[in-house]
């Protein structure tokens, strides 16, 4: 689990391609035009090791903007992971690769390369706004965006949340009930067996 401890960490749900992988790093943002991955190619020439490529694809899933070749390049570069608000292809190959990858969908249809899109601009991914440099965290539960400006505040909040959850786990293992742990008031239980 990735406890962020704050609602300031906006959730961007995207399906993980290979379970068990995590990502954490600063966002490098790309906006693509419908089905055109030219801007992603441009971003891959300037992205730094460990950064997370976040692609605003408008949620379109009828043309893939990512596939096996880009994943191979990303692994070679040392990318920290990829989040795409759009479709990928070559799923069988991507599942075998050691690259954290989250996407909205998949399709067999490949991209166009018409030269559209932009790199390093504020974008919206899954209805969550983010900027280059924001912190991206992802695991089996999905992806969260932490604005760069409040990363230290979120880190402290997350540390407190982890300590709190460890205390709860200990109480559960010691045999305490949820009612006692969380100070739940008596709730009437309706019995429909009449």
Can you say where each PLM-predicted feature lies in the sequence?
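Translation machinery proteins
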Residues: 11-39
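Acidic, glycine-rich flexible loop/linker segments
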Residues: 104-181
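Extracellular/luminal Protease-associated
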Residues: 43-86
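Single conserved hydrophobic/aromatic residue that forms the stacking wall/gate
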Residues: 1-5, 9, 13
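Histidine/lysine/aspartate-rich catalytic loop segments that bind and position anionic ligands
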Residues: 89-106
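Short coil/turn connectors at secondary-structure junctions
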Residues: 24-26, 48-51, 77-80, 96-99, ...
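General beta-strand structural signal in soluble alpha/beta enzymes
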Residues: 11, 32, 54-56, 82-86, ...
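Conserved, helical-rich catalytic subdomain that frames metal- and/or nucleotide-binding sites
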Residues: 176-193
